[in-house]
Amino acid sequence: MGSDKRVSRTERSGRYGSIIDRDDRDERESRSRRRDSDYKRSSDDRRGDRYDDYRDYDSPERERERRNSDRSEDGYHSDGDYGEHDYRHDISDERESKTIMLRGLPITITESDIREMMESFEGPQPADVRLMKRKTGVSRGFAFVEFYHLQDATSWMEANQKKLVIQGKHIAMHYSNPRPKFEDWLCNKCCLNNFRKRLKCFRCGADKFDSEQEVPPGTTESAQSVDYYCDTIILRNIAPHTVVDSIMTALSPYASLAVNNIRLIKDKQTQQNRGFAFVQLSSAMDASQLLQILQSLHPPLKIDGKTIGVDFAKSARKDLVLPDGNRVSAFSVASTAIAAAQWSSTQSQSGEGGSVDYSYMQPGQDGYTQYTQYSQDYQQFYQQQAGGLESDTSATSGTTVTTTSAAVVSQSPQLYNQTSNPPGSPTEEAQPSTSTSTQAPAASPTGVVPGTKYAVPDTSTYQYDESSGYYYDPTTGLYYDPNSQYYYNSLTQQYLYWDGEKETYVPAAEASSNQQTGLPSTKEGKEKKEKPKSKTAQQIAKDMERWAKSLNKQKENFKNSFQPVNSLREEERRESAAADAGFALFEKKGALAERQQLLPELVRNGDEENPLKRGLVAAYSGDSDNEEELVERLESEEEKLADWKKMACLLCRRQFPNRDALVRHQQLSDLHKQNMDIYRRSRLSEQELEALELREREMKYRDRAAERREKYGIPEPPEPKRKKQFDAGTVNYEQPTKDGIDHSNIGNKMLQAMGWREGSGLGRKCQGITAPIEAQVRLKGAGLGAKGSAYGLSGADSYKDAVRKAMFARFTEME
């Protein structure tokens, strides 16, 4: 009993509790926190094991979208975009990174406020600003500011001393570092991220031990961190009213894009931009090259006054993921593919005030040997791919342009990185001469011997010659023109081009002769393919010829009939000139595509003059010659229907005094038109008549309502509905005091019981009122003692009594 310490009532039920209770409560809270953390860690492990089988097929972007379904105001920032960053701050473990974390932000602040504040400062501008929000849309009080480079982030932190003042509140800035991913390992064969518990690669079955052994020490984190690698990049912070043309104009110095390469995301309701756009290129290599160019710009890229953030568009495909080591080699191979596009854009990008200088890897630099090896592999691959393709010829200029296999120019979006020189640089292209500058060494005395096999030309080793404007090849002594892709031999004064099949330089004269002769087998194949096309082209040319002749004949007849107005004469002249020009064009040109483009316009003009011919052309197909024969036969027969000697119309059986009257009859008479229509229909077959009637039915509008009115007549309009009017019935209400107050009321009986008699006043000495109190109507807005506030009206008075009393009161006031 002595050892037991009893707790008093005061200690047990005090206001703040006893000290023992507080100690026990603190210990219980610490145990619960440890238990929660252990449970969270174990649940994470169980969740990782549970989704082991299909997590490999999902990208981190989808996982973040599942975890964070809310979006910010722009529509493309989610709360989970920085889910892999460490939010906890430890000054001792802080490392520099290009992402800065802002803590302690006001709840009412938005991303636009942070972005405007950042842009107001001088110095490097951020690439992206993301405010972290809860699922309800309320700010969590911190944001991430991402810069393009690490140097920009460090200089920003040093300039602001790791502190900012936003809306009068001091904000602390810290570097945000990604959490280390020790649980994942990267397969070196298929570049797939696998969980730490998986001993073999999920895709290719490679051993985990082999992948860990190949990773050099000290690069574990860099090898395990995987970036996205695809052919599409995303442009962020797009203005709400930016159009696709503005994006193409901003990216034109760095890439050759088409409208279908850019996808601008808009809101379905407001039709305004949601703040981001996608740019898809021909390959992932081109996308990585463009991304490097845009991220290295100083100042950063701006579109419509907005600083644009650039990054890879995160795809759901795991095949596009490459480690850092493999990406370096891919960039080296991509540089060779982009070289051809850089040459082709020289003239279009160079202006009058400056020239374009392209920088290539020169001998002696780091990685030049590896760069050359990848270039040769890339060129050999495309030589094999392009070996069976034929070179296209230009039909308009007449010159033959051959595409070299060494410099493959793709029709997909092309990349070119250029550096403009000062305005004082020479821009005119001079004729190449034997004397070279210091940058181009002297040509070899032997020169290029036709027929000798040479190595594939490497455009990266060429040196720019300022005196001639060409690029000099030190291995062969030739000058290279990037615009025409021809080589110039200064010794023989001859132009050459590279033939990938023969692996030699061929003179341009031989190329034209070879192009004209061609191979018999190829020629026969082309003739077989072009037979139906040439037949269709001949038919179109014949149609044009007939149309031109008919239009000119109508013009002559119209001139002979009478003198028209000047405007009509000019219009006829333009139509005839258009017909002649169209016919001449179709006689000269052999391309079917151009004929199909010009034919509808010319036929449309001719249809106004000859509606029946338009129906005939629509009824027949252009592949048969029966149509041509039929039209020619009808025209010849129609010409015989007029006797120009007797000045008579044989169809209508009428004779006219002169030629002008006969022409006017043919052009303006309704009778002649009806007879001509009947005559033409009689010459057509049943199938042709059905086709003509079908077209007339389609062209003519049938007014069914008018036909119905003619058949049944117009019905009489219905009588308008009258609204039913109900007379409000009189309501009999109770009027007990209309004839005065009698003795039977309760008040009278009570007063009589207290000693009051009728006719005497109230009070002890009967000095009070003798008449009962009546309700009087008072003027609205007037006080109780105001003059004229009451006219002696009561609630039982009629309108006539009220007017009479009011008039009497005004009369007494005047007195």
UniProtKB/Swiss-Prot annotation:
A zinc finger (C2H2-type) spans 647-672. A zinc finger (RanBP2-type) spans 181-210. One of its GO terms (cellular component) is spliceosomal complex. Residues 1-93, 385-468, 508-539 are annotated as: Disordered. Residues 452-535 are annotated as: Sufficient for interaction with ACIN1, PRPF8, SFRS3, SNRPB, SNRPN, SNRNP70 and SNRNP200. The keyword RNA-binding applies. InterPro entries: G_patch_dom, Nucleotide-bd_a/b_plait_sf, OCRE, RBD_domain_sf, RBM5_RRM1, RBM5_RRM2, RRM_dom, Znf_C2H2_type. Residues 411-422 have a biased composition (Polar residues). Component of the spliceosome A complex (also known as the prespliceosome). Appears to dissociate from the spliceosome upon formation of the spliceosome B complex (also known as the precatalytic spliceosome), in which the heterotrimeric U4/U6.U5 snRNPs are bound. Interacts with U2AF2; this interaction is direct. Also interacts with ACIN1, PRPF8, SFRS3, SNRPB, SNRPN, SNRNP70 and SNRNP200; these interactions may be indirect. Component of the spliceosome A complex. Binds to ssRNA containing the consensus sequence 5'-AGGUAA-3'. Regulates alternative splicing of a number of mRNAs. May modulate splice site pairing after recruitment of the U1 and U2 snRNPs to the 5' and 3' splice sites of the intron. May both positively and negatively regulate apoptosis by regulating the alternative splicing of several genes involved in this process, including FAS and CASP2/caspase-2. In the case of FAS, promotes production of a soluble form of FAS that inhibits apoptosis. This is RNA-binding protein 5. The gene is Rbm5.
